[in-house]
Regions:
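Sequence/fold signature of self-assembling virion shell proteins
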Residues: 1-52, 57-75, 94-99, 165-181, ...
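Short, charged, low-complexity loops and linkers
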Residues: 23-25, 84-89
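Alpha-helical scaffold segments that mediate packing/assembly in large oligomeric complexes
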Residues: 115-195, 333-337
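Structured, hydrophobic secondary-structure cores that serve as assembly/anchoring elements
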Residues: 57, 65-67, 72-73, 86-87, ...
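Short, polar/proline-rich extracytoplasmic segments that appear immediately after membrane translocation
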Residues: 89-90, 147
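Conserved loop-to-helix interface motifs that mediate assembly, gating, or partner/ligand docking
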Residues: 148, 152, 204, 214-218, ...
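Short, glycine/acidic-enriched capping/hinge loops at junctions between secondary-structure elements
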Residues: 78-84, 327-328
Length: 337
């Protein structure tokens, strides 16, 4: 026993930890399990969530929405002697408001008897499932709004604009897994982003797993750069991060890949709906979309009274966030059309 005598204490009694802290016998007995569970949930969330960090992020404090400001290009003119410089009274400025969706939860009830009879760690498995569920919802929202960003005109239209909007690259019908078509799309995307003066740092491509492996298995290594791994075994296994034309390549099952029409869901305060029948990938820079987050991924469990009444623990993972397009110029959608 980690704490001598703990196994003989009753509910409501206390024990003194080696640190000198006095806690309830129940808290001391189960503290390690809950910490392990929380850690497993965060680990699973972070490993499954690939969109995190590839777009702009804001944490909300005492607010329900975040404001983002766009600025357009300005002109330069020659000064005429004797005339005042008054400046532009209508600078090219626009705003984008991104609100938070309703609270997103993933939960499970862990019955004590099930945990006792199982020959594996139920808490560990459940923690991973909760983490994956939150990460999947997070990624799906972001990838949809990036696709919508690629189809959106820039909000600043004033002179000397309009500013460039999003772009769609069509691979051709049935070419979603064609390696050469994908390579051509990468170089076309790099050219488009350069022509729009989009920063080269933070450029990312997201493909389906089948596209990803078709690409890295068929493309010449002179075109495909690897961040690490120098053997053919690394290439065949898909280990490492790969780049084409300075664009980092990732794979995900959370793209709206040839998904058809995706409707709105109750609780979503941003619009993630759209027709994704021809969608087959994304290439974007981090300014293409933004995420606002009010509550980061957290874990909650019921207390001792509930455990006694129901002979188990209700375990809840929660996340409060919202996402929407930000700068359309930084978003490119690949379509099999």
């Amino acid at each position: 026993n980690k704490f001598p005598g703990l196994g003989r204490t009753g509910f409501g009694e206390t024990v003194t930890l080696p640190s000198g802290q006095v806690v309830s016998a129940y808290d001391a007995k189960y503290a390690t399990y809950l910490k392990l569970f929380t850690g497993e949930m965060f680990k699973a969330y972070e490993s499954a969530c690939i969109a995190k960090g590839t777009v702009q992020n804001r944490t909300l404090r005492n607010g329900k929405a975040a404001q983002f400001i766009f600025t357009g290009r300005m002109t330069a003119d020659y000064h005429v002697p004797g005339t005042p410089i008054l400046g532009s009274g209508d600078p090219p400025v626009a705003e984008k408001i991104i609100v938070m969706d309703d609270l997103l939860v993933s939960s499970a009830f862990l019955y004590d008897l099930d945990e006792t009879l199982a020959h594996y760690s139920l808490r560990s498995e459940i923690s991973k499932k909760i983490g994956h569920a939150l990460a999947e919802a997070y990624d799906k929202k972001i990838f949809r709004v990036i696709a919508k960003s690629a189809r959106t005109a820039h909000p600043i239209t004033a002179s000397p604009g309009p500013e460039p909007g999003g772009s769609v690259i069509k691979l051709g019908a049935g070419n979603e897994f064609n390696a050469q078509a994908l390579v051509d799309a990468f170089f076309e995307a790099a050219s488009i982003l350069d022509e729009k003066n989009v920063p080269s740092a933070g450029r990312t491509a997201v493909l389906s797993p089948r596209q990803y492996y078709a690409l890295i298995s068929q493309v010449d290594t002179n075109i495909l750069n690897r961040d690490y791994g120098n053997t053919q075994g690394n290439l065949n296994s898909g280990e490492g991060l790969y780049e084409i034309a300075g664009i980092s390549i990732r794979r995900s099952n959370n793209l709206p890949f040839m998904a058809g029409t995706v409707g709105r869901v109750d609780g979503e305060n941003n619009d993630y709906s759209g027709d994704f029948a021809a969608h087959c990938g994304l290439i974007y820079q981090r300014d293409a979309a933004a995420v606002v987050q009010g509550i980061g991924p957290q874990i909650q469990t019921t207390g001792g009274d509930v455990k006694t009444m129901y002979q188990g623990d209700l375990i809840v993972g929660r996340l409060a966030m919202g996402a929407d397009w930000l700068n359309p110029a930084a978003a490119i959608e690949l379509q099999a059309a």
